[in-house]
Amino acid sequence: AQCYRKEGNYPKALEYYNKVEQAQPDSLNLALQIGQCLMALERYDEALAYFFKVEYLDKKPQNARRAIGWCSFITGNHQQAKKYYDLLISEPKPIMEDWMNAGHVYYILNETEKSIEYYRKAQELRGSHDEFVRLYQIDKKDLIKQGANEVDLFILPDELI
């Protein structure tokens, strides 16, 4: 399953993960991997079920929360995405992606000042403006699908300089 996943053959990886799941239904690591395959296949609602299971059962659910936040954002459930990214950035050491994705959510919710604040924190953790912009551009199509103004998306990174 992992070989297929690394090759990008998510349907085949999922087929094998599901077979392993029958033998190991309580494996949280397996549940995360199945959820990630489902995300790659854009089957977000199914993926969320796995991620919620991991969040509920795991002592350190940050990875599940990141996935829940992103699936929620992509499916237009921005309030739920906000809840999960707020949880992540309130942790002692949020990662750069937590700040960036929180920025995306707040931008879509028309809280531009907050989004700029969070993008700044992401940029600080990334170490350079150029590297931040490169990663920001990767998410541009997802932001547009969520209703972002394409012109704003070109201007927003300049606010961080």
Q: What residue spans do the PLM features occupy?
A:
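Conserved structural position within tetratricopeptide repeats
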Residues: 19-22, 52-56, 86-90, 123-124
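Terminal, low-structured helical/coil segments at or just beyond the last alpha-helical repeat
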Residues: 125-161
